[in-house]
A protein has these predicted regions:
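N-terminal start-of-domain structural block
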Residues: 1-3, 121-122
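N-terminal pro-sequences and low-complexity stem/linker regions of secreted or lumenal proteins
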Residues: 25-321
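Secretory targeting and sorting signals
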Residues: 2-25
């Protein structure tokens, strides 16, 4: 049984898409950056979180790609991290809401009226941005954009009704190019939570893993060169799901089980606050990543992340001075 099974389902299926009229690329950040209270001292060192989600690659296959193995050896990694389920979309939903809420396909028309990460970050005054490579304009909500190789099923934020029906919240969904200038500026120019979805080639969905790894290495280099990352940055790279035949996952007791999950995937932790080369073997999954973000920013727990059996990423961090 997956952890998501412990959550009540609140799925609303819409019969049509939300309006997809392009809007200007503009997402002003709030000037102040409040320092939230932290319940876990090691996580309290983190000032800014970056998350990159790649596509469809099992752990063993990922570690066989030289560029990915190099990143794992240079930074830190989780050797027992598991996706939620198959196919893609419910993994993205669990990463941002703590459950799958009845979604079992890559439906482009689904809408969810459930608490979610974007909503909670905004409610707490935490700046955030969801950056989608290939997205034609801010708050563009169409299911596909072939010229940019963009797929809406890899943007979880477009599925939450409170985000897509709010002009202010929807403006947090941005083309990836909008992040470039921010990274070149001071830390305050970059949102405190940054989500990055590559296009269908660079995430490895439609192109070879070697090509996706080359893109990822370049993106990691750009982020780690930025003042924002150097100032207590915490970058996590994970894969939405593993090999389709791999059904391993983490159950409600926090143990690895052979069925009910989305497979064994590589997860990288890249931060100046982490010991290089560290490998953590604690069973972790997408709920663990969401729980870690919640604890860093002192957010209410979403879905199943409130369960004590869900481990977080605090073991990756050096003890605070």
């Amino acid at each position: 049984m997956r952890r998501a099974g412990a959550i009540a389902a609140f799925l609303i299926l819409a019969a049509a898409t939300v309006s997809v009229a392009p809007q200007p690329v503009l997402a002003p950040l709030a000037a102040p950056e409040p320092a939230p209270a932290k319940a876990i001292p090691s996580l309290g060192q983190v000032h800014r979180v970056f998350v990159i989600v790649m596509e469809n690659l099992g752990y063993r296959a990922a570690m066989a790609v030289p560029a990915l193995r190099s990143l794992a050896e240079r930074y830190a990694s989780a050797s027992q991290y598991y996706a939620t389920t198959h196919p893609s979309l419910p993994n993205y939903i669990s990463l941002t809401s703590g459950g799958t809420y009845g979604i079992t396909t890559d439906c482009w028309y689904c809408q969810l009226a459930v608490p979610n990460l974007g909503q909670e970050l905004s409610a707490q005054g935490i700046t955030w941005g969801a950056y989608m490579q290939g997205l034609p304009a801010a708050c563009w909500l169409g299911p596909w954009w072939p010229p940019g190789d963009y797929a809406g099923k890899h943007d979880p934020f477009r599925y939450y009704t409170d985000i897509v029906t709010s002009p202010a919240l929807c403006q947090h969904i941005q083309p990836l190019r909008a992040l470039r200038a921010r990274l070149a500026g001071p830390p305050s120019a970059v949102p405190r939570f940054v989500w990055i979805t590559p296009n269908l080639c660079n995430d490895g969905h439609d192109c070879p893993a070697v090509q996706a790894a080359a893109w990822l290495a370049g993106e990691v280099a750009a982020i780690t060169a930025s003042p924002a990352w150097k100032d207590g940055g915490f970058l996590v790279v994970t894969w939405d799901e593993g090999n389709g035949a791999d059904r391993r996952g983490v159950d409600a007791a926090g143990q690895v089980v052979p069925t009910g999950g989305g497979g064994h995937v590589l997860t990288l932790v890249i931060s100046p606050l982490v010991t290089p080369g560290l490998v953590i073997a604690t069973p972790l999954d997408h709920l663990s990543l969401l729980k870690t973000v919640e604890e860093i920013f002192n957010l209410p727990k979403l879905g199943a992340t409130g369960q004590a059996s869900v481990a977080d990423f605090s073991a990756f961090l050096k003890p605070p001075h």
